Amino acid sequence: MASSYKMSEQSTISEHILQKTCDHLILTDRSGLKAESAAEEMKQTAENQGNTVHWAALLIFAVIIPTIGGNILVILAVSLEKRLQYATNYFLMSLAVADLLVGLFVMPIALLTIMFEATWPLPLALCPAWLFLDVLFSTASIMHLCAISLDRYIAIKKPIQANQCNSRTTAFVKITVVWLISIGIAIPVPIKGIEADVVNAHNITCELTKDRFGSFMLFGSLAAFFAPLTIMIVTYFLTIHALRKKAYLVRNRPPQRLTRWTVSTVLQREDSSFSSPEKMVMLDGSHKDKILPNSTDETLMRRMSSAGKKPAQTISNEQRASKVLGIVFLFFLLMWCPFFITNVTLALCDSCNQTTLKTLLQIFVWVGYVSSGVNPLIYTLFNKTFREAFGRYITCNYQATKSVKVLRKCSSTLYFGNSMVENSKFFTKHGIRNGINPAMYQSPVRLRSSTIQSSSIILLNTFLTENDGDKVEDQVSYI
């Protein structure tokens, strides 16, 4: 029995060892499966991260690069092209600066947050600075569009007062005011700062939270978007109404006699006859060989007729400019409306799904960034001067084209609006007495029949050439 007990005990011990061995093998097998499963998860995560980086690269080429390149071209065009250096176009250049800064400092960092799955990858102190620049440059872009619409409406409604204030200095003052308003709207972000968790400082999301910036998200959206949007819509329709009213008056006005275009008594003296080829005294004092045809009456009336079309051409150019503005505002509305509506909803709606709204904000903010790259495209499509300048700059040709303006120089000094004293000073400076060069003086009896006619042609050519130049300028500045 003892022997039997020992064998039974031995058998029991052997079975116990065998059971433990089997359990160990099973655990080892399960551990191997877990390790294999963990490896698969790590591989899947790596693939997902690779897809995120690839998508980020597509965003760089699709949004950021065109935004930077297009706005640089706009800044170069206004800076180098004399035909584009007008007060209104300085607004466009400042708008391009704001959009360029969005492409340089805001979009790349926003792209980094996408690559790192919304975790702030830079030093913590840079987070409020980046948020401030984001709000500042985006607000400045919106405010510039609002200022341009206001400026256009005032120029059409009160052209005389607007022309008196339409200087480079005045434009720079207006631009400064726009930037100061934008800074005032964005300044609460760095003052308030972000609420950082010191324990998890490496896992911070750089965004405006509802708890800390709820009131700013609401009132900032009203000041930076909805108020300018209201102003733009109202001024745009008022501008269209004013242009239609002007066009109606131009089409239905009675034909005007040209009695106000009588030649000044300063020039109603004898002048040399141009019916034969000889040197003609130009208004800038130079000499030029020129033959005037005998049918000077027909030429004069044709030039007067073309000058009479100036108001209609101006109305047409202004209507075209308003259409371009309408396209700009339409794109602006489509690009920024989703973001600001979602932003206000996030600030007001407590029962809404906050995670879903934050995800929509991350998508819609990039739609808003696209607006910074759309503006240069619109200028390229609708403005021939911008289009020609962009084409030359892309081929590294930065030399501005020279506009042909033969009598433009003297027209800025001598024209009907000047006083008689100013015109007399001009003649004295260029050695012309009573509108005549002494070296070219001939007998009054010989030239009596063509005196007033020839002098009228000289000054009317100057006046009409100036009008033609204004016509070109109107076509250059569409905004």
Curated annotation (Swiss-Prot):
Glycan attachment positions: 203, 353
Topology feature Cytoplasmic, residues: 79-89, 151-170, 239-323, 382-479
GO molecular function: G protein-coupled serotonin receptor activity; G-protein alpha-subunit binding; Gq/11-coupled serotonin receptor activity; GTPase activator activity; neurotransmitter receptor activity; serotonin binding; serotonin receptor activity
InterPro entries for the chain: 5HT2B_rcpt, 5HT_rcpt, GPCR_Rhodpsn, GPCR_Rhodpsn_7TM
PROSITE patterns noted in UniProt: G_PROTEIN_RECEP_F1_1, G_PROTEIN_RECEP_F1_2
Residues at the site labelled Hydrophobic barrier that decreases the speed of ligand binding and dissociation: 208
Cell compartments where the protein resides: Cell membrane; Synapse, Synaptosome
Protein name: 5-hydroxytryptamine receptor 2B
Species whose genome carries this gene: Rattus norvegicus
Membrane topology: Multi-pass membrane protein
Domain of life: Eukaryota
Lipidation sites (S-palmitoyl cysteine): 396
Record Gene3D superfamilies: Rhodopsin 7-helix transmembrane proteins
Cross-referenced PANTHER family: 5-HYDROXYTRYPTAMINE RECEPTOR, 5-HYDROXYTRYPTAMINE RECEPTOR 2B
Family per record: Belongs to the G-protein coupled receptor 1 family.
Intervals of motif PDZ-binding: 477-479
Tissue-by-tissue expression: Stomach fundus.
The keyword Translocase is assigned to this record: no
